[in-house]
Amino acid sequence: MGDYRKKSTLLAVVTLLAAGTVAAGCSKPQEKSSGAAVSPTKAGASAAPEKRGKIKMSLYDRGNTPAAEGSITNNRWTKWINENGPADVEFVAVPRFESKQKFNTLFASGEAPDVINEFETGYRDQLYSQKQLLPLDDLVKQYAPNYTAMLEKYPILRKIGTKPDGKMYEMGRVIPSSVQVAVFIRTDWLKKLSLPIPQTPDELLKVAKAFTEQDPDGNGKKDTYGYSLAYLGDEAIDAMHGNTMFIKDDKLVEDEARMKAAVSFKKRLFDEGVVDRDYLTDKNGEKAKKDFLSGKLGIYVADNANVDFLTTLRSTNKEATIAPMLMPKTEFGQYTIRMLNPLQMTTVVYAGSKDPAAAMKEMDFMLAEKTWKTLKFGTENVHWKNDELGCPRAINPDLRKIEIGYNTDLYMSATTIDSKEICNIPVVNKEIPNAEEWSKIKNETRDLYENPAVPLYTLTHLEHMPTLPADLLKINNDWTQQSKDLIAKTVVSGGSYTVDQAMNDLKSLKQKIGQNQTLDWYAKWYEQNKKNAFLTKDIYQFLAKK
């Protein structure tokens, strides 16, 4: 990531709460933030030194720490934190994508860390319901001047971090939002075939068919295809049809017609032969990504694309050009797919902590501007230097990749908005191949996708959806998997299993497992919380600078 200077259907809950949905849990801390520029302080400068606390703090392990740097819990940056922070911290490694299992093991063995850093809202809600968390109001007031300033500047953080008992249990960060998932199309292929960027569903099918049948790469082989229904490609079709719960007449409702339209279009793409016939085996979309970057796929739905996306494509397709495109407008409206969550709760304190004061002091130190800048940018004149505006600018990219690239979760709770406003505007590093061209593509993407007139298709960001009660969560999970199976069956079965048959079976399944209870619960939640809930419309108040 570059440095910044100038920066309802029946499938309703399938999309919002399906296992495997990538949300910010997978998102990497952004190059953004700390409006609360309060230095870490120690009470009573003239008084005797306070006794140094000792705590445990969880830290995601993504398996990306270079051997030369040590381990994720013992490296130059964890040592720096212990040398400069107010407490002795024992970092506890938690596998990023198996965090719940690891935390459960730690709780069961009585080894839960004092400070728990966890992106997943549902798991933090579970810990709250099990009374495993400490309320933080008094601790923040007494020991966290930096976070107190954050709450004054962004009072919505307190509201989001407060649980039903009226007490604040979670600390979080502000990350100016930008597009997370966007659709990219091979414009050199469009030019060769004299086709425009598709604006309607029929045009999308026409372009996908041409990319599949008319040899757009000119190699004389039938080895390209137009679209992938794998992973995010499937969600993009749902988004195109607004296929989720939505607000109508100030109520949260679903619409079977939206689901049927989405399923029908997926089936149409498959029947026309314009998608990978084996897309169901591409569970995480890696094959689709590989096919796009190797020049075999014409339209790709990308998650957090960056300059490497373009550089990799150009490595095997030197003349390739790409552009962002919106999914076409349908009778249900026009929507985008995913945005980064601008208000992200990240951190809680274990109710069994032996030194909650030390835990809070350490957390406040970790989110201080001086701290996050050190962790994010590294050492001055080694990893960065100030530019002409006095903003930190990366140097030695290869060294940074080795010595800094693995440490992003150390500042996952920090609002990394520079107190010097001009330093939050992105600057292009011209030393990086394709950086200038990618910057233009990125700005085009943001112009298309960061528009409240073409909103996210979901009610809100996944992390701001309420957590279902355990019984309804099981019902919803069962519905998610079984409904997906039925939809996949009709998509690939030709005339032997029609969309109408699938819709009838989905209706029966919904009644059988009691999914209506889940939808009713969400509708009631919306009715009770619509005035205070953080919804899609609110995201556009927190857009990143361009």
What is each residue range found by the language model?
Residues 137, 163-232, 246-286, 290-291, ...:
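Helix-loop-helix "hinge/cap" segment bordering the ligand-binding cleft or interdomain interface
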Residues 75-91, 105, 189-190, 255-279, ...:
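Extracytoplasmic/periplasmic ligand-capture domains
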Residues 6-10, 14, 26-183, 187-203, ...:
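Conserved N-terminal structural module of periplasmic/extracytoplasmic solute-binding proteins
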